[in-house]
């Protein structure tokens, strides 16, 4: 990855530092928003979002994505430091068709939510590179899951989850 932009940005959640990274293998752009500072080796509140930055129409139609983002930013603002990484996934037509088919099943079950965008295993490597650039190796993982998921591959990237924080 290559860091292409690095500047402070005013958001509805306050001032954050925005970094944009270009993935050289496929020209995808990933975004990191950070607040505050930390020392090397310090555990940092972190959320890693897999998203389709340019085209998540299903999420827009069915989810309250703003509510989820509000909760994530609120948590980071509470502790006055943290990172939110947006891993941008390439939109492929067949994957979109698969998500539409899954949406149909969810709707038939009365669920008003979009199917999750599944994180590609390659995304862990990209996320790890971004985290290392941010000098984050110990993570307090922001998650909306009630049961912590084992992230087996993270140790191989020199990352450690020290805690799971619900938002």
Segments (PLM) and residue ranges:
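Catalytic domains of riboflavin
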Residues: 1-167
